[in-house]
Amino acid sequence: MVKLVKSIYTNSDVTSLGELSATDSIDQGIAGAITALTDAATITPDLNASNNFSVSLGGNRTLANPSNITAGQSGSLFITQDGTGSRTLAYGSYFKFAAGTAPTLSTAASSVDRIDYVVASATQIHAVASLDVK
C-alpha cells in the first residue's frame, strides 16, 4: 500500500514531510495507473502492483483470487474481448457479486466490460460489473 504524505511549506520551500492524518484533507485529484495484466488461462492480479487493471482476453479465462489483498482497497478491472470475441471469464471464490451471480461478459469482438471492486476482507471482494461500456 502507498502512504500519502503531506508537505509543510514555509515561504514556498518544503520544510518537512509527514503522513496525512485523519484531520488532513486532499484538495486535488489522485490518479492511479491502469496496470496491464498478462493474458493467460489463469489471470492473477497483484493488488500491491496497482488498484486498476486491464486485460484483453485471448481465450476463455479464469480471474483468480488476487494476491496481496488489503481490506478497504478498491479499484477497477477493464476487460476487453479480443478480435474474435465470445470469450468467457470465470471468477475466483473471493469475488462476490449481487445475488451471488457472476456477470456474463459482453461477447462482441473488442467490447469492453468494467468490474469495480472493494476488498471487504481477506477472503471477500465485493464486485459490480458495467457491461458493454461504450
Set out the residue ranges of the language-model regions.
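A sequence-level detector of short linear motifs
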Residues: T15, T104, H126-A127
